[in-house]
Regions:
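N-terminal targeting signals for export/organelle localization
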Residues: 1-97
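Short, ordered coil/turn segments that flank beta-strands lining enzyme active or ligand-binding pockets
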Residues: 101-102, 216
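Short active-site neighborhood of thiol/selenol oxidoreductases, capturing the structured segment around
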Residues: 106-135, 148-151
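Structural microenvironment flanking redox-active thiols in thiol-disulfide oxidoreductases
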Residues: 129-185
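Short, solvent-exposed cationic patches
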Residues: 127-133, 203, 236-251
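Thiol/disulfide oxidoreductase modules built on the thioredoxin-like
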Residues: 185-189, 193-235
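Short loop/turn microsegments at loop-to-beta-strand junctions
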Residues: 93-94, 115-116, 207-210
Length: 251
């Protein structure tokens, strides 16, 4: 498998593998009177296995990534950094109203009384594609009366590159919906579509594969720059346990 890569690509993947995951404290804390969790930030998906990273590298043009100009890198870094400033943990999450691939409407404020969990995805975002099957398992694990899990389809990330030759950049909401329906064909997790103006992505941070957890009252309690099913599951379990403890104490 390594034979398909050049020397720069091998160096890139080795750095990714050696870096590993960045530290994350899973202990819940109180903020503004509610249970919240530490954010997880990283410029690279360090929690993926080496095999997963190899799979990701087969889908993208690593040389193109290396060939970005300083201005392009600066813009990319600025966009990725918005996840740190947009929609802070412990505060009311920005509301949104999005159409799903089945013609229904997903409105975050309608999820009050339930925990909402979502990840930004795209057909040409290999880290997100790596997570899709894992999120299906998570979707099946939790009762929908308590936890609502869904994807938000946003901008394409590696359109036309090595693993996605047939997929082009979307220039309209209808084109984005077409790509989102392709994703719906390979997952049972509901897929909502962010319009081409990217209003939802801008509200939550311009990151390709970020994940968010909103509590029953509509407050953001966890966000991760790269979706990691293990962290998501851990936070959900602790949230539900905390709710049960509160009920017991109040009873």
């Amino acid at each position: 498998m390594l034979g398909v890569f050049g020397s720069q690509e091998i160096i890139y993947m080795t750095r990714q593998y050696m870096a590993g995951d960045t530290p994350w404290n899973s202990t819940p804390r109180q903020l503004n009177g509610r249970v919240v969790f530490a954010e997880h930030y990283s410029m690279h998906p360090g929690h993926y296995t080496f095999t997963q990273k190899l799979g990701i590298a087969t889908k993208v043009d690593v040389k193109k990534m290396f060939g970005k100009t300083p201005a392009e890198r600066k813009k990319e870094f600025a966009e990725y950094s918005t996840i740190r400033t947009q929609s802070p943990v412990g505060f009311l999450a920005p509301d949104f109203e999005l159409e799903t691939t089945t013609g229904e409407t997903v409105r975050l404020s309608d999820k009050r009384g339930q925990i909402a969990v979502f990840m930004f995805v795209a057909m040409t975002c290999p880290p997100a594609r790596t997570q899709v099957d894992l999120w299906k398992e998570l979707h099946e694990k939790y009762d929908t009366k308590d936890v609502q899990i869904f994807f938000i389809y946003s901008r394409e990330r590696h359109a036309g590159e090595r693993g996605y030759r047939e997929l082009k950049e979307t220039t309209s909401t209808s084109e984005r919906m077409t790509h989102a329906r392709m994703l719906s064909e390979i997952t049972a997790v509901p897929v909502a579509v962010d319009p081409i103006d990217e209003r939802t992505l801008k509200d939550y941070g311009m990151v390709p594969n970020a994940a968010f957890i909103i509590d029953r009252e509509g407050f953001l309690v966890f966000k991760s720059q790269w979706a990691d099913i293990r962290k998501i599951d851990q936070v959900l379990q602790q949230l539900l346990v905390s709710e049960e403890l509160n009920k017991t104490n109040q009873g």
